[in-house]
Amino acid sequence: MNNFDTLLQSIARTTVVCVGDLMLDEFVYGEVSRISPEAPAPVIAVQRSEINVGGAGNVARNIAALGARCIFVGLIGDDEAGRTLNAELASEARIEPLLVCDPARPTTRKVRFVSEHFSTHMLRADWETAAAASAEIEQRLLDAILSQLERADIVLLSDYAKGVLTVRVIATVIEAARKLGKRVIVDPKSANFAIYRGATLLTPNRKEFVTATRCAADSMDEIATAAQEAIAFADCEAMLVTQSEHGMTLVPRAGEPIHVPAMPAKVRDVSGAGDTVAAVLAVALAAGADWGTAMRAASAAAAVAVSKNGTAVVTPAELRRKILPHASLAAEDKIIGSDAELDLRLAEWRRDGLRVGFTNGCFDILHPGHVKVLTAARGACDRLIVGLNSDASVRRLKGESRPVQNERARAEVLAALEAVDLVAIFEEDTPLKLITRIEPSVLVKGGDYTREQVVGHEIVAARGGEVLLIDVLPGFSTTSLVEKAREGTS
């Protein structure tokens, strides 16, 4: 636990320069219940759709989600998809997008039609130009990349063969990075590994490895033998072959191969799992992890990623839960730091069909009355979010002498309780804005309120939710406890 937490803290201090093919992933969810009368083709009744930053952009988002800083260089067209991608990346606090616009090509866009019920892909439509970038665009890409290398702890090239990573771009970046003493990880697409000559690590999947080496890759010995030949050919330090449910095998230039089995996972969607592996390897190695530690973290992250729909990111809290399934979630991971983090947790819970509950208060001095309400609230839902008044909010409501404990202390006490799954601090006098964002299925307050007095009851009722009032425990009040303490009584 301590070593893993130290690794996460180190990751948060790293910077990755990520270069690669950016694409817009769109997922259209629906069901097929009939055949078109116009042609023998299924008709999809669309229920919802969503967009995600895909390709190398998904690598960048995973790097940022793990707490590292990512300087991302990619290519877009002068179109709506490109503008959407630019806006999405720019909205990420830890991503610094340096996107080159090429009006002569469309932004790569992939639309997947997915069964909402079975989570299976029915059709994919692609808009793309895979031709290599022109000499002018190539130079603009290099200018952007080379100007940022000194800031990097590690460089990651994510090749989807859509024109960004030309032979010249790859060779120039690897040479420049090596001169600066920066390691370079490549997630390759080309079957000619020689174009990545001089990289630190290549991370092909099994299919890419078999195509490039003409090796059957049916055993670890076969993989090791073929990888050593490829390492010599590409002049790299190591090769890591990902093998889906069979785990991943790393073959170093010197030393014994390392195999890490795949972690168990309920597979919903494998889109972007390779991006997650590359991102975790990069940040872990940049943070000082050895090969084995980086691989175990990457394997755990891949298991989390494939359990989600669409191209998804993995958070430190999710990674911790996967690596340490029997350990309690650390209290600090229950305290939400941003709206984006809250949205990620909510999306994860809703994908799993979990019932989300909400209650709120100042919780200045935690007492048995609070514990009763929190325990009852947790019993009425699968995940409980506690809205906590900020210090400024408490002062406005209770007076200048309150709170007794600051908001961080109050949040840590609440987060240490087993009944509490998340703590969200709000600045307003009421949690209405927070409730509107969360849209809980259950809204809980003490029985000293009426249903109509509970802030947000209309929002919950409108969505078919429940407002639950818990009988208060007589004799317990924070105000009376504070007064007794000041009077010196017990």
Curated annotation (Swiss-Prot):
Region (Ribokinase): 1-330
Binding site for ATP: N205, R206, K207, E208
Active-site annotation: D275
Region (Cytidylyltransferase): 358-490
InterPro entries reported in the protein's UniProt record: Bifunc_HldE (IPR023030), Carboh/pur_kinase_PfkB_CS (IPR002173), Cyt_trans-like (IPR004821), PfkB_dom (IPR011611), RfaE_dom_I (IPR011913), RfaE_dom_II (IPR011914), Ribokinase-like (IPR029056), Rossmann-like_a/b/a_fold (IPR014729)
Catalytic activity reported: D-glycero-beta-D-manno-heptose 7-phosphate + ATP = D-glycero-beta-D-manno-heptose 1,7-bisphosphate + ADP + H(+); D-glycero-beta-D-manno-heptose 1-phosphate + ATP + H(+) = ADP-D-glycero-beta-D-manno-heptose + diphosphate
EC number: 2.7.1.167, 2.7.7.70
One Pfam family from the record: PfkB
Protein name per the record: Bifunctional protein HldE
Organism: Rhodopseudomonas palustris (strain HaA2)
Gene: hldE
